[in-house]
């Protein structure tokens, strides 16, 4: 059992090291995109399923409340947080539309959609991205594996942050770390620390 624990930690560390080498440019571009959207008076919508839903909610909470330091609230909304809306849409046998309908209702040109999917093939996330494109939103996609269908929907103005792994658990771990990096970059760009 102790060896298995060490394997889990080692795999996680190796995935983080690979991500640290491969992803800084994409993470930086995503943060700049989000900052520009916020400075223009827009908002960030985010969505995911399962563990990715938790990551989306964490991002929105960090924007609205704070990340590591006190600052004004920033407009972000997790589309998977409203169970009434999600179950209302699902009860009409439109599960694939649970995020797309919300994007069409709430998304405005200049907003950002943070779409999180470990394999990039979740139908409801794909449809949310398609809806965001029709609303002239930009997209930040957190993916893994080969990026799936989601990667093929992105335009040159969008950013894919693809975790270099083929294990969902490792991908989700680095998605959370990536969200923390985005929050840190957004905060430090909009509200630079005096002691930096």
Curated annotation (Swiss-Prot):
Quaternary data: Homotetramer; dimer of dimers.
InterPro entries the record matches: DiaA, GmhA/DiaA, SIS_dom, SIS_dom_sf, SIS_GmhA/DiaA_subfam
SUPFAM superfamilies with a match to the protein in the record: SIS domain
Keyword entries, A-Z: DNA replication
Protein name: DnaA initiator-associating protein DiaA
Residues of the SIS domain: 34-196
Disulphide connectivity of cysteines: none
GO BP terms, alphabetized: carbohydrate derivative metabolic process; DNA replication
Stored Gene3D superfamilies: Glucose-6-phosphate isomerase like protein, domain 1
Function (record text): Required for the timely initiation of chromosomal replication via direct interactions with the DnaA initiator protein.
Gene Ontology MF: a single term: carbohydrate derivative binding
Family that this chain belongs to: Belongs to the SIS family. DiaA subfamily.
Organism: Photorhabdus laumondii subsp. laumondii (strain DSM 15139 / CIP 105565 / TT01)
